[in-house]
Amino acid sequence: MRQYLDLLAHVLENGIDREDRTGTGTRGVFGYQMRFDLSDGFPVLTTKKLHLRSIIYELLWFLKGDTNIRYLQENGVTIWDEWADENGDLGPVYGAQWRSWPAPDGRHIDQIANLLNGLRENPYSRRHIVTAWNPAEIDGMALPPCHCLFQFHVAEGRLSCQLYQRSADIFLGVPFNIASYALLTMMIAQVTGLKPGDFVHTLGDAHLYKNHFDQAREQLTRTPKPLPTMWINPEVDDLFAFGYEDFRLEGYVADPTIRAPIAV
């Protein structure tokens, strides 16, 4: 994906060096946008291989409203281990906000169910928004949401999604986020009778950690390959009924993984 390599190059060449919460140090820019036409193929990196299993199971975990890593660990996914407490809990992170946002009157709001209803009943609304940024519960979260708000848009029978990501770990996090929200868009398009449109990824603080510079430069020496396609089981018409076996990435050819340390 040339869009992603352009982002890497832009930050390396034009970013500003700053200290950060983790003490690692970053180079970054504030404000950057990428657009992916989902009819061109599934936007997963081909210049390094990604662990698609982790991406799919994490998305299913979000949609379940789960905030304990037990489900992830049972399915071989360890990407949240560093932030969980001794019981595997993360506090009211993404899944809780998506599926059970606490209202002042004691109700809990299922933002995903509301989104689906809105897309079916009033597709041209400008209110198809889900947010994970709940100021009242930030302090109880193991990690405040990085990808914090997304909006859907319907035009000419195509469903597009724009994600706002306040904090974007370009080397490790952003490739996962692109694939995850592209897949979510395709899933929601299927269950609402629409075709996938664009995924627009808007980044706030887009940064490379200093201990990822060499890995980013190595990736920039690689040439992108044709995008694969994502097969989604056409029999599934309920967003909450999808399982891991309902997805298959076809034609995925990628360069080897480039390992990099995670900043906690």
Swiss-Prot record:
Its EC number is 2.1.1.45. The keyword Methyltransferase applies. Pathway: Pyrimidine metabolism; dTTP biosynthesis. The active site is at residue 146. GO terms for molecular function: thymidylate synthase activity. (6R)-5,10-methylene-5,6,7,8-tetrahydrofolate binds at residues 51, 169, 263. It is found in: Cytoplasm. Homodimer. This is Thymidylate synthase. It comes from Chelativorans sp. (strain BNC1). The gene is thyA.
